[in-house]
Amino acid sequence: MNKIPLIVIVGPTAVGKTALSIEIAKAVNGEIISGDAIQVYRGMDIGSAKITQEEMEGIPHHLIDILNPDEAYSAAQFKVHAEKLIEDIYSRGKTPMIVGGTGLYIQSVLYEYEFVEEDQALKKELMDHYESLDKETLYRLLTEKDTKAASQIHINNRQRVLRALTYYEMHHKSITDQKKSHTLSSKYDTYIIGLNMPRPTLYDRINRRVLLMVEQGLVQEVETLISKGYRQSQSMTAIGYKEMIPYIDGEVSLNQAIENLQQNSRNFAKRQLTWFNNQMTIEWFDTSELTIESIVEQIAANIPRDDNDEFS
């Protein structure tokens, strides 16, 4: 039985994944599954650089605006949703595509992650105990028990703090050392495309994108989310949102908030590139040297297909 062909487009923030993905989808009769951890949330549009209906140009997109900002979402949930969508898209004669920058989400689909089974009764007992504690106490406990995890988790990201504490108590080791077993080969016929450009060019694009976000109403978007009661939600710790809260609270100037967002976005892009290079076999394209048309042409010649595929 032939494997289902799957096109994956990855790359750092602001590199141009959206525009290229639309052109590829047109060329291969594709539908796009968003591989972004924040674009699943309704009302978090500007800060996540969510694609607009106009930008979609009629290409169907999935896993965008499916949750409220106070609802949790994980790689395990993404895996279930994405696998169902891939089969559905393919069954309708279309080419499934995953586009995004949340590496663990995408990897969970490609490499058959099996999320570790745990003692659910013990886990619930621990979670119930920790749920009664305030965030300062929770974070202090995590710092005492698992310094490495605490250094990588924001104090306001209550769900991740809870998960790290619970994992440590259950397994007596840091959640940062957790290994999720996966097979070395994918059940899909996968073509992974990576977009990149020289670091100075990418950083300049990031800086300009942040300024555009502010012009488009990022501060007002964050204020609206706060007014709806989402201030303490895990989603609000995402880059693009957490930097605006101190400005709204009167703790920093708008210029400082913008600089913080630009710096955090640049750091995130660097981490994304490192992660993708270490975790996946990718064919990279420099978007600063190649036109979208030339990239699409090269990609179309290498797209996985079965004997029944007909690409327009």
From Swiss-Prot:
| Classification via HAMAP family | IPP_trans
Q: What GO MF annotations does this protein's record show?
A: ATP binding; tRNA dimethylallyltransferase activity
Q: What is its EC number?
A: 2.5.1.75
Quaternary structure and partners: Monomer.
- The main enzyme category here is transferase
Return the annotated site residues (Interaction with substrate tRNA).
102
Q: Which cofactor does it need?
A: Mg(2+)
* Catalysed reactions, semicolon-separated: adenosine(37) in tRNA + dimethylallyl diphosphate = N(6)-dimethylallyladenosine(37) in tRNA + diphosphate
Keyword terms, alphabetized: ATP-binding, Magnesium, Nucleotide-binding, Transferase, tRNA processing
What's the family? Belongs to the IPP transferase family.
Q: Where is this region: Interaction with substrate tRNA?
A: 159-163
Judging by the UniProt lineage, the source's domain of life is Bacteria
Protein name stated in the entry? tRNA dimethylallyltransferase
Gene3D superfamilies in alphabetical order:
1.10.20.140, P-loop containing nucleotide triphosphate hydrolases
Q: Locate the residues binding substrate.
A: 13-18
Q: Mention one GO biological process in which this protein takes part, according to its record.
A: tRNA modification
Q: What is the role of the protein in this entry?
A: Catalyzes the transfer of a dimethylallyl group onto the adenine at position 37 in tRNAs that read codons beginning with uridine, leading to the formation of N6-(dimethylallyl)adenosine (i(6)A).
Species this chain originates from: Macrococcus caseolyticus (strain JCSC5402) (Macrococcoides caseolyticum)
Which Pfam families is this protein grouped with? IPPT
